Amino acid sequence: MSNRPNNNPGGSLRRSQRNTAGAQPQDDSIGGRSCSSSSAVIVPQPEDPDRANTSERQKTGQVPKKDNSRGVKRSASPDYNRTNSPSSAKKPRAFQHIESLSETNKPPSKSKKRHLDQEQQLKSAQLPSTSKAHTRKSVAAGSSRSQKRKRTESSCVKSGSGSESTGAEERSAKPTKLASKSATSAKAGCSTITDSSSAASTSSSSSAVASASSTVPAGARVKQGKDQNKARRSRSASSPSPRRSSREKEQSKTGGSSKFDWAARFSPKVSLPKTKLSLPGSSKSETSKPGPSGLQAKLASLRKSTKKRSESPPAELPSLRRSTRQKTTGSCASTSRRGSGLGKRGAAEARRQEKMADPEGNQETVNSSAARTDEAPQGAAASSSVAGAVGMTTSGESESDDSEMGRLQALLEARGLPPHLFGPLGPRMSQLFHRTIGSGASSKAQQLLQGLQASDESQQLQAVIEMCQLLVMGNEETLGGFPVKSVVPALITLLQMEHNFDIMNHACRALTYMMEALPRSSAVVVDAIPVFLEKLQVIQCIDVAEQALTALEMLSRRHSKAILQAGGLADCLLYLEFFSINAQRNALAIAANCCQSITPDEFHFVADSLPLLTQRLTHQDKKSVESTCLCFARLVDNFQHEENLLQQVASKDLLTNVQQLLVVTPPILSSGMFIMVVRMFSLMCSNCPTLAVQLMKQNIAETLHFLLCGASNGSCQEQIDLVPRSPQELYELTSLICELMPCLPKEGIFAVDTMLKKGNAQNTDGAIWQWRDDRGLWHPYNRIDSRIIEAAHQVGEDEISLSTLGRVYTIDFNSMQQINEDTGTARAIQRKPNPLANTNTSGYSDLKKDDARAQLMKEDPELAKSFIKTLFGVLYEVYSSSAGPAVRHKCLRAILRIIYFADAELLKDVLKNHAVSSHIASMLSSQDLKIVVGALQMAEILMQKLPDIFSVYFRREGVMHQVKHLAESESLLTSPPKACTNGSGSLGSTTPASSGTATAATNASADLGSPSLQHSRDDSLDLSPQGRLSDVLKRKRLPKRGPRRPKYSPPRDDDKVDNQAKSPTTTQSPKSSFLASLNPKTWGRLSAQSNSNNIEPARTAGVSGLARAASKDTISNNREKIKGWIKEQAHKFVERYFSSENMDGSNPALNVLQRLCAATEQLNLQVDGGAECLVEIRSIVSESDVSSFEIQHSGFVKQLLLYLTSKSEKDAVSREIRLKRFLHVFFSSPLPGEEPVGRVEPVGHAPLLALVHKMNNCLSQMEQFPVKVHDFPSGNGSGGSFSLNRGSQALKFFNTHQLKCQLQRHPDCANVKQWKGGPVKIDPLALVQAIERYLVVRGYGRVREDDEDSDDDGSDEEIDESLAAQFLNSGNVRHRLQFYIGEHLLPYNMTVYQAVRQFSVQAEDERESTDDESNPLGRAGIWTKTHTIWYKPVREDEESSKDCVGGKRGRAQTAPTKTSPRNAKKHDELWHDGVCPSVANPLEVYLIPTPPENITFEDPSLDVILLLRVLHAISRYWYYLYDNAMCKEIIPTSEFINSKLTAKANRQLQDPLVIMTGNIPTWLTELGKTCPFFFPFDTRQMLFYVTAFDRDRAMQRLLDTNPEINQSDSQDSRVAPRLDRKKRTVNREELLKQAESVMQDLGSSRAMLEIQYENEVGTGLGPTLEFYALVSQELQRADLGLWRGEEVTLSNPKGSQEGTKYIQNLQGLFALPFGRTAKPAHIAKVKMKFRFLGKLMAKAIMDFRLVDLPLGLPFYKWMLRQETSLTSHDLFDIDPVVARSVYHLEDIVRQKKRLEQDKSQTKESLQYALETLTMNGCSVEDLGLDFTLPGFPNIELKKGGKDIPVTIHNLEEYLRLVIFWALNEGVCRQFDSFRDGFESVFPLSHLQYFYPEELDQLLCGSKADTWDAKTLMECCRPDHGYTHDSRAVKFLFEILSSFDNEQQRLFLQFVTGSPRLPVGGFRSLNPPLTIVRKTFESTENPDDFLPSVMTCVNYLKLPDYSSIEIMRDKLLIAAREGQQSFHLS
């Protein structure tokens, strides 16, 4: 579709201006999050980047305020709320006729038949929607009406130029695609063409013109465009949005693209007369696809000339949800806004032009909190005259239809449109025509309105009841043109009829339903607030009062200010206790909304209600309590600087009640609310120290200890185990602890903190910014937003983009307006000086003389002491176990305060259990300057207070070493080369450091403040814009001042210049840019290179944040100053405390290092030093407190590693002997050569355990693994964004930016089409396979024969429906194209962003200067350059071998299976000679001194990691060194877990951004596979889901484990994964057979499998879980012959299970062996079943389902390819009886060997001795054994084995063969098939994260365990009639905790569908088990009924039984009888 000329010569100035922006090709966009969309993924790009950028803003169009005058100046905006029409003389004739019809208001009865015919026609016209399909249709249809056309044409033309234009336009709009969402503006009276998608969006409904409703939300405009884009682009794929009507869906399907081509093709012929009208809103009229571009202008002028006719609805109003942006999910995410081709800059221009268009400059200003929450613009008349609906208002008489269509066609034909076009268009036009005029809702409303205004009450009642019905069934589509303005006053009048309760109640309901169906009507309903409140002040009828509360609650979401100022808060709470619980919730929700932006002047409105609200906190109802908490949190937030108000708020028991609320178990507060409440406490303490003192006296320390550690049992000093909490919760809790302590001083050693906090003292608190609502009231922005705006204002920005609460606003400083990006709503803003600003802006308060906290420390030392003792250890533990910098910085501040204010004695007591010194040492080696400064301050305080103790420890732990290093280092803190930080302008640097790295929070630049929302006096006011990271992404940055030419310092190379010219020169400032904070190193570098006084306006895709003109000098100066301070302080420290080295030797503790060094030297491999040196090491490790620093510096680690692993010729002693010596010393195993005859058993492992712990401490201190987290600390409570999701900003970034790619055919191939579409824009998170899908369905995947045409087939955009369907439906599409960037072949399941970042040439150029690990968004260049992606067809030979991942996997390439040797020769050896391969020793793999191949990372701790890996292997496999050892680990694997690495891994895996981009750090995946023992099972399970499967599954897993991630910004719907689901119905009678076919079809599909049973209504999670459980059971049937074990029948058989035998093996199932002579047919059948089992298990893992198969350990070893190391120990796990006999016989073999080695024996005595060797008194020969497998006489162990007896001489061979056949040879074929099946779903190599014994948990869930009542209480949720205190709930928990294993399984299967719980038990059940009350009629007895369940949501519906016995019986009956059926309960 090419750019079209402006064919509207009469267009106004604004139109021609806009044409440049408008005329551009249509964007398609790749949004490939989901495989479900076949075409909606790529955006062909206009070549001109400037023009391309105009895409996003043309959604604006301001709506002036209500104004009923009709003066000349308002001519551009006719008042659509009037019902009188202009005189008919002024109308063209055609319209007089139509109007007369309309006014009769007849129902459309006559046209019904025609309507149906036309729908039939429409259906017949549907073709696969290819862009050209419709234009090729038969031409005939159009010609039949030509006579009529000519007639009408002449009559129209007579009307002269003005009316002709209107008439022409009236019809011209018809052939356009009447937008699937009708004209927004009409109903709103707001008439703007809003989306480029087409002017059709404006021309879709007949009566919009006549609409009286005035309240379009600006959002609706966006929606229109979005839906059209979707309809146009993703016809074959994307499912229609939920709220679109079915007719509309049809429309969008059939109307897809055909209607656009003719417009494009024929528009040049159209030349319409000039129109006088200017179109302020028609942002893109020229290029709108559906019709000749001039037609829209006509439409508008038509609308103007015909002004008002009678009310009649537009066909459909765009469905407006609360947030109009929520639709941007999934694969079309990018189409919704970008796809339209509208740019933000264009929108800005549109806004400016609109200002010109409206002479009075009226702007619509929206009421109250709409800016912060849901946008609800309500202006009355529109600022532009294109109302967007066709001006037809007839009721649809059939006679007029033909003539209308005819006239329309005639007119268009006369304008040069060929008649054949009307063939395909005719039926559709008339169908749309019918829809627009046939809807009777509006006319019905008019009739009812008359009824409401009647004088007769019965008539009024009837009318109001019908009005309720109309509204409750309606939505925005069906209620188009509803006369809100007239209906509301009429309803308000009825509401005041005090004597008639019925009428009042229904009137109240009608208003509520109206706000639900038409959200914008709330602006008009606001007038009813006083009347609603009247109903609450004097309650005459409780129903009316409750209904009024419901209405007020809806109003309060947008108009809380109006309610507050009408005194509504107190009125709503007046009779709170009288209402039902739902009404109470509403009342409290209103209160919370009223507090949202309350100002100190309005405090009197709430003051009286505070006691009541405080008391409400003790209530049991969760929702009420949360609303009340929200209320207080908002009050505290808004009054945080008003100390006296804070005290009033907290006066009435508030602190006590909240404190109790925090510790209630089970918790009432959700995670987000918990964070908010704790934050509220912090704010109170920080700003009002007296409240802090009050809390201390109320024993807040115990509360905090409980919240962090759970209930303490005994001494809290010993072992501190933290309760698992999210980083955000930890952050707020540590903040609170920090605020409870007095502030630190700001002089002396703490003076540097001022530098850390404030870069330059720019004061952003100096002013308050406010915006004005509809009523002219001013509302303040919340604190953070206000700071962002002020910061931008101070540096002279023209405008900034502010993203808050899911909306994006442009703040325009020139016009002082705030403009909503989505909707174009504009509001006035103003700046007011902040009276409070000067009280305390320095960021540090002077220690006030009356800081009550400091006073308390002096006056009540006991209280202070207990506080510090209770919390110091906990803080310390939080610091050690947190990876996020925000939490660590906050902990550090709190610890510093405690250490500073505690006296020496207390400190000694508190610190004695903590290795403070080694922590300080590792902090000093951190790369984060903030941490280094804190560590130096701490060291200084400790040396001042406890010099004797710490002078020794600081030496031993390496503190002194590090401080000296800091004092001497020239280039301070230069990090390892990989992490160079110079010039980054960031202190919270991102280099690998113990503190974790680049957090989006670290403020890169002079504001070195922590990301955290510091609330304290000393920290609090540093809430710089990034306090909430500001969400600032700016587009246009033309600073008002300063030259416009960039001057760069000499760049490093040409590429840099190029990069800088195109990319933002993000000069950073104290308040820093968004991306700089994400990766200071990368983005900061640009700032260091550009001269700050001459800033080029950065224009790229929003990559720069608040780019500020802060001089380079200030930034680097500040950093340099801090570095200088560190160096100077370190120097002073050494001088003061360690200058005299005379202390050496004076303290015995200092000798440890010497001893260790001496022992280490003796671990020499060349000289045999015996075991003495090991004994010395053992004593040092286990008896002295050797420090990590000493271990590091003695060379011990490296030497021990070599000692245990080296295998060189030169070694004096062999490795095996060294290992045995080591085991002897550390584990008391026998020395080499002294093994006993009996079993070698583990004795004492304490020394080895001590060594492991010491090594783990070393690892924790040395490792510097980077963590890519994006700590986005929360905003404040007032905006409700209290848990603003970390990572969501960056996700937003990905949602709003696309990569520019050029698709090119690979030079190597010429047999596929060449892409001619120019550059495309691709969603960065789309997968590479989305590009393939996009190209293949357009025919680019077809390989041409040589003789076919080359590239001129011109059918680029033709979509092959069959291929599209194939892509949609099949999980296993054959790949047709492969893609390259440069030489690199791209994996299909890689995101495009990852591919570009990893392989693009630019990426390679940049990598030298970028620390790739830590930068999630890549360099600016990634977003500005065009990346070339080559495609070529997949070669046949490659296809078969390719391991295609991402759900389209073929068989993965894996190592050849090492089962019994495959080739014939070896087979012969086994069969003929009985020679079997020797058992592999698993230890060998680990005993290497160098890193294994799959460890590629570098880290200072690498040697320690390798040593721990060796120690773990020795502990796990030591028994392979002895031939008679007990098979048992020395040390449990759990002892090897490293808490610091675990914290880092967990933190990393909780970050949505990292998971979405697949950007997991390499160290984590590599350690996870090579050293899984460092991490607990659940961490590895999460890591497995993140790395093994697609991104959506990883996100789903993340959301299941951390539900709070999705609690914030709902518009970030991209966080929500889009997992396809495939549903299959199966028959219970043939379950196994059907399961096999389901797995055959869908096993390898990426879609989630859902199962339903024939003739049962249940569907969803429960039946699916039961399917896996039942199939597992079917596979255990004895008749299948799959397993070893005994046959049993089920204890509680159902249906077909009766009489069926099943296999049971208490040790676990293992495959039944085959002999050499087994029948091939039988083998094939069994192999098929095993292949199916492999698929089933892999699919279960992939879909988070559980199977119920009790498999044995050897089975899992086979899965992990460990079959070569199976020994007789493993035999015990499949057949204990045989295994015991084998053990006895092995003992005989060992005795025989001893005898043979005994030199003293003669031949005769040896013979005699051998004959006396017996087993239970029998000689071997007497046992009567032959060479067959025990238990399987038909399986021979070697050829002719039946006839070979076992004797003492061949006993050893016999035992080897038995073990080999039972565990390997006999079962290898089954396991090969199993592995094949498994790998067809995903590669088995991904299971390397687990040990064999853990796979059972992964597959089958948690082990059977008794359930205790306490756990049940914490994990189960009573609801709907029950609470934790209900009798029935207590009964239930008591019963469940008494269940045995079988009863547990029955109960679980009944309630959840699966007999097993996931790992973690009830705690991990998702959704949680919910117990609800089953209700009955009053006449019924609950004891007569059984409980029922909803398995999909784990609901147990439990009657309230009279006794525990009855409940127990009923539960067991239900559980037994309720199996295997899903019917309605």
Swiss-Prot record:
Reaction(s) the record says it catalyses: S-ubiquitinyl-[E2 ubiquitin-conjugating enzyme]-L-cysteine + [acceptor protein]-L-lysine = [E2 ubiquitin-conjugating enzyme]-L-cysteine + N(6)-ubiquitinyl-[acceptor protein]-L-lysine
Renumbered residue ranges of the record's region K-box: 1529-1603
Function recorded in the entry: E3 ubiquitin-protein ligase involved in ubiquitin fusion degradation (UFD) pathway and regulation of DNA repair. Part of the ubiquitin fusion degradation (UFD) pathway, a process that mediates ubiquitination of protein at their N-terminus, regardless of the presence of lysine residues in target proteins.
Protein name, entry field: E3 ubiquitin-protein ligase TRIP12
Primary site of residence: nucleus
Basic residues biased stretches: 1034-1047
Broadest EC class assigned to this enzyme: transferase
Pathway(s) per entry: Protein modification; protein ubiquitination
Chain positions with N-acetylserine modification: S2
Originating species: Rattus norvegicus (Rat)
